[in-house]
A protein has these predicted regions:
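Short, contiguous alpha-helical
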Residues: 2-10, 18-65, 107-160
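Acidic/histidine-rich alpha-helical segments that form the ligand environment
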Residues: 67-107, 115-128
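Short, solvent-exposed, charged loop/turn and helix-capping segments
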Residues: 16-19, 94
């Protein structure tokens, strides 16, 4: 699941122009660079929760605003750091026992840890949601310029 989500995200981020990276469909909407920054921050939090057993910010503890503010809006650097954190997370997850995963999930999510192994899949689900958001932004960007969408389902249940 993690490998599939990562490959889909990488595919969704291929061949981006600088304009497309920063484009917003509305002034209050997220741009792709903002989403990648968000994913980078959260990937580090997931890694820290799995690797050293710390509580998950925004869920079990308050978000460290000073640390968040220190992460610049630099698409290339954030994508690089996201990949490093995500890859490390998956490597550690592969080597983690179910008992340790259960313990780290409880530490990460506190009272929200009703799902015993949530730490093992939460990041992939979160990233998949934002991957869909990025694809939608890219399709809207192209549509606004009279170009065909780049992400069209190849599935007979969708009309042509």
């Amino acid at each position: 699941m993690h490998e599939l989500v990562w490959s889909r995200l990488k595919e969704a981020l291929e061949d981006l122009s600088q304009e497309e990276i920063h484009w917003r469909s509305l002034p209050q909407a997220n741009a792709i660079d903002v989403i990648v920054r968000h994913l980078r921050i959260e990937a580090q939090w997931h890694l820290d929760s799995l690797q050293i057993g710390v509580a998950m910010p925004t869920i079990a503890v308050a978000a460290p605003q000073e640390a968040i503010d220190a992460v610049p809006l630099d698409f290339e650097e954030n994508l690089k750091r996201l990949e490093e954190s995500y890859t490390r997370f998956v490597d550690i997850l592969r080597a983690t026992t179910l008992a340790t995963l259960r313990q780290r999930t409880a530490a990460a999510y506190g009272e929200m840890s009703r799902q015993t192994y949530r730490l093992g899949y939460h990041q992939a689900a979160h990233m998949a949601m934002h991957c869909g958001q990025i694809r939608m932004i890219r399709n809207l960007y192209r549509k606004m310029r009279g170009e065909p969408p780049g992400f069209v389902p190849d599935n007979p249940t969708y009309p042509k």
